[in-house]
Amino acid sequence: MKKVMALSLGEVILKGKNRHRFIEKLIKSVKRNLRNLDHGKIYHNMGKIYVEVSGDNEEKLMNRLKHVFGIVYIAPTYEVETNWETIEEAVVKIVDETLKDHPEYKTFKVKTNRGDKKFPLNSMEISAKIGGMVLKNFDIKVDVHDPDFFVYCDLKKDTYIYVDKIKAHGGLPTGTNGRGLLLLSGGIDSPVAGFLMAKRGVLVDCLHFHSYPFTSERAEEKVKKLAEDISNFSGELTFYSVNILDIQKEININCPEDEMTIISRRFMMRVADKIARDNGYDCIITGENLGQVASQTIDGLKVTDAITDKIVFRPLIGMDKVNIIDIAKDIDTYETSILPYEDCCTVFLPKHPLLTPSIEGIEKSEEPLDCDKLVEEAIGKMKIEKIGGSDEE
């Protein structure tokens, strides 16, 4: 009898002719997230990936596997040969463990998936036989409508017995949908946007704008911590840090006050566009949400997007703030995001920002600025570092 983690694959299993490539990517992600942890063989068998457990580090393996996109459920499982003696041994062991942890459980139900169609019994007959094993060894009852717990049996070449199915994040394996450059601030929204795009298989790197010394080094350390949190899901990432204070000063001197926010956003998009082109990114990602702040009106977003012909993904665009906060708490970025450090958007903040800008009007206001030079100078002072893929347990 062998202890394994059984990983259910969700969308990956629907990929038809490309399924093999997605499974390979997923196995690679699993291996990356389990580095520096003892474990046995990792293998694919009829729609699931299995990780052999070594020693007493099951909880550590579970915590790491929860961060792998493409996995829907994780089940601590006993793998045995497909014969009734070893199956009963596994069933008795796992039910005994379950009842010790949950003495309040009084009822159960068996669910069987018969992958080996050559096996002489059908799924209902197998479930009945396993149910008999439980009733013979424990003082509990069958309840097919509302049981306290399930005993699952996946019968393949070998047989897999489990009770718990721990929910993971699902999605697609990292790196199966291109590369994206995330505009990462210190707020609640942008880390969630990065998480959601990484969940769809995008390999996410981060671009952060600051206005040092008007913004502090502690503010940038906060953003680096958020980047590290994202990397726990997507692996090591590149962190670009760009000081836009000189750009903001030029905007403050030369442009109408009510247009400063939208013009600053356009410069951020210019910098992002240049970095994306120079480094082969397929898309730009932001945490913008329709109507949340002055620059996030339909007109404002249209004026911002006019800077680039790269696709700009805004995965939060129609979400309520409470839903965004729920995700931030779930992925452990919320507490860092609400730390009270200033960001570059608070520098030269207009009292009454323009809500309905036009491309023609904003381009007219930008005429006194040497946009290309300002962007080149900012990128010339850019700092780049690798962050994350931490060994957090």
Question: Model-found features: residue ranges?
Answer:
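A short alpha-helix-loop-beta-strand transition element characteristic
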Residues: D332-P340
